[in-house]
Amino acid sequence: MRTIAVYRPGKRFPSVSVTGAGCALLCEHCKGRFLRGMVPAVSPPALLSFAARLEREGGTGLLLSGGCDAQGRVPIGPFLPAIREIKATTRLLVNVHPGLVSPQEGRLLADSGADRIAFDLVLDPVAIATQLHLARSPQDYIDSLDALCRAAPG
């Protein structure tokens, strides 16, 4: 029988926002509320410092996310070297929630050493426009998922 690992946000596996409480979209389901409950780490040094403290205090990992830009992307790029360092210097699991990605961004995420990618696959064009406030299409979500799958090791 296959085992499914579940990581609930909490003290040992907190959610961390690379944008603090900032978000360009303010989607209908969140309007920034979820971001306010996340640990802010708006610079790579802040993320590294938080990760070191989390491990010292018995943490098991973190969800790295944040608010989206106007294109539906979480600005993870500047944090990729920090993710690599966290993976090299701690035992923490890193789950990244990047939003929409290009093929190049998918490869860079895979190269960062992140353990997991959390991806929202939204295929309803009305929901994308009215709930997420994005001028994107279902195909953009499919292309992003494809980019992540192609970049995934193994």
Go through each PLM region and give its residues.
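N-terminal [4Fe-4S]-dependent radical SAM core
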Residues: 1-39
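Structured catalytic core of nucleotide-sugar glycosyltransferases
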Residues: 4-7, 16, 49, 58, ...
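Core AdoMet radical
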Residues: 32-47, 54-78, 86-149, 154
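N-terminal, well-ordered alpha-helical segments
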Residues: 14-16, 25-28, 45, 49-52, ...
